[in-house]
């Protein structure tokens, strides 16, 4: 029997307001890197392409992405992420301390402990792959439409869409919205 038994991960906070708790992750698809974040209450999804080889990569890029989120949605109480180098860098830890943000790392032994981020990555990858044109490049208008549909699609459990939870109303679009998620 190993001397270091695996202990279950620290339980995430239960958010009561939108963007009080968010889950974040990075992923790679078709030669591009993306930062994805999801509000744990509403399911609101944000996807940002990260330009490798610029100041958008690494911890500096993570902090730029988080500042954009905070300027739009407010300062979260808790951010959940994996233990990737961007999230565990000294600069990131200092940023979280300065802003009073609790950083919850998912366990390598319990990857599902950051399930909201994993679901966000899966959704973002599907949207990106579904909206690549014949030339192989991303159709940005189609991607925006996909995000609008995602944000307007009601959750089967609570019967509200991320937009309804966050804004109190659906987003204005000019196309039908699916009621299935």
Segments from the language model and where they lie:
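Residues that form generic nucleotide/phosphate-binding pockets
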Residues: 69, 127, 131, 149
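Short amphipathic alpha-helical interaction patches enriched in hydrophobic/aromatic residues
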Residues: 45, 128-135
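Short, charged, surface-exposed loops that flank catalytic or proteolytic processing sites
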Residues: 132-145
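Core structural elements
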Residues: 148-156
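Retroviral integrase
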Residues: 1-126, 156-181
């Amino acid at each position: 029997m190993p001397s270091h038994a695996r202990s279950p991960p620290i339980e995430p906070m239960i958010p009561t307001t939108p963007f009080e708790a968010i889950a974040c992750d990075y992923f790679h698809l078709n030669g591009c890197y993306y930062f994805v974040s999801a509000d744990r209450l509403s399911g609101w999804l944000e996807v940002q392409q990260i330009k490798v080889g610029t100041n958008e990569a690494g911890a500096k890029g993570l902090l730029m992405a988080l500042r954009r989120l905070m300027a739009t949605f407010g300062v979260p109480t808790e951010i959940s992420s994996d233990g990737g180098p961007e999230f565990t860098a000294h600069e990131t830890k200092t940023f979280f301390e300065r802003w009073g943000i609790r950083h919850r790392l998912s366990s390598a032994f319990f990857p599902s402990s950051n399930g909201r981020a994993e679901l966000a990555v899966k959704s973002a990858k599907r949207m990106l792959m579904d909206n690549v044109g014949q030339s192989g490049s991303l159709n940005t208008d189609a991607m925006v439409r996909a995000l609008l549909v995602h944000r307007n699609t009601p959750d089967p459990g609570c019967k509200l869409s991320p937009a309804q939870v966050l804004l109190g109303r659906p987003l204005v679009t000019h196309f039908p919205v699916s009621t299935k998620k």
